[in-house]
UniProtKB/Swiss-Prot annotation:
Induction: In response to mating.
Signal peptide from the UniProt entry: 1-23
Function: Male-specific peptide with moderate activity against Gram-positive bacteria.
Protein name: Andropin
Source organism (scientific name): Drosophila simulans (Fruit fly)
Cellular-component GO terms for this entry: extracellular region
GO biological process, any: defense response to Gram-positive bacterium
InterPro entries hit by this protein: Cecropin
Highest classification ranks of the organism: Eukaryota, Metazoa, Ecdysozoa, Arthropoda, Hexapoda
Expression sites by tissue: Ejaculatory duct of adult males.
Localization annotation: Secreted
Domain of life: Eukaryota
Principal subcellular localization: secreted
Length: 60
């Protein structure tokens, strides 16, 4: 979650500093944030089945 906050702050600083005409930087940051988010989702998707195989079911 920290990376998202950092990217939001950077996006706001750049939006204020460069103005709306140079919003390319904002688009790049948005694409980076989306890529990081998708990578995290993929990592969780891979780790969850492995975790379920390794850890015994404690509720049964």
């Amino acid at each position: 979650m920290k990376y998202f906050v950092v990217l939001v702050v950077l996006a706001l600083i750049l939006a204020i500093a460069v103005g709306p005409s140079d919003a390319v930087f904002i688009d790049i940051l948005d694409k980076m944030e989306n890529a990081i988010h998708k990578a995290a989702q993929a990592g969780i998707g891979i780790a969850k089945p492995i975790e379920n195989m390794i850890l015994p079911k404690l509720t049964k």
